[in-house]
């Protein structure tokens, strides 16, 4: 069974993926670590403190790796790197809560704002929905990691989230715009 856990940085992918893999007795794979260990990146972006990957090369190597294994919980911000999955879960988090989480990590404003804006517009969720026939979206904002795992195992999904419908998120967007202006 290949389970993909995806979402913007800061939504809890690592914690949930590790917990899920332990509960199911499946291998855990962090795609970013996979990329770094195999040097599947083009360069390092100092401003964003992140590696720029070669999508095609990563997808090829990742899918070759997955073809040799049948029981993996895979964590990634790039769901389209995976050709086949038995279950795809998109974790979502209220943008204000996500903003606070990313700031706590000590990330610079540009990196924080880009990731919060990606969550607001549902960038990762949209990519997952375009790439896979079925996805399960879960708003993790007020859930513990254990509750999220229980929802995954129980196949309890939320309706797709549209953060732009919320006035406080619109206010947050305006505030973020002022920071980068």
UniProtKB/Swiss-Prot annotation:
Region NMP, annotated ranges: 30-53
Domain of life: Archaea
Entry annotated with the keyword Transferase: yes
Residues the entry annotates as binding ATP: 10, 12-15, 105
Listed GO biological process terms: ribosomal small subunit biogenesis; rRNA processing
Keyword Kinase belongs to the record: yes
EC numbers: 2.7.4.3
Keywords: ATP-binding, Kinase, Nucleotide-binding, Ribosome biogenesis, rRNA processing, Transferase
Pfam assignment, any one: AAA_18
Region (LID) location: 104-114
Molecular function terms from GO: adenylate kinase activity; ATP binding; ATP hydrolysis activity
SUPFAM superfamilies: P-loop containing nucleoside triphosphate hydrolases
Record-linked HAMAP family: Adenylate_kinase_AK6
Record note on quaternary structure: Interacts with uS11. Not a structural component of 40S pre-ribosomes, but transiently interacts with them by binding to uS11.
Family the UniProt entry places it in: Belongs to the adenylate kinase family. AK6 subfamily.
Function according to Swiss-Prot or TrEMBL: Broad-specificity nucleoside monophosphate (NMP) kinase that catalyzes the reversible transfer of the terminal phosphate group between nucleoside triphosphates and monophosphates. Also has ATPase activity. Involved in the late maturation steps of the 30S ribosomal particles, specifically 16S rRNA maturation. While NMP activity is not required for ribosome maturation, ATPase activity is. Associates transiently with small ribosomal subunit protein uS11. ATP hydrolysis breaks the interaction with uS11.
Protein name: Putative adenylate kinase
Organism, scientific name: Metallosphaera sedula (strain ATCC 51363 / DSM 5348 / JCM 9185 / NBRC 15509 / TH2)
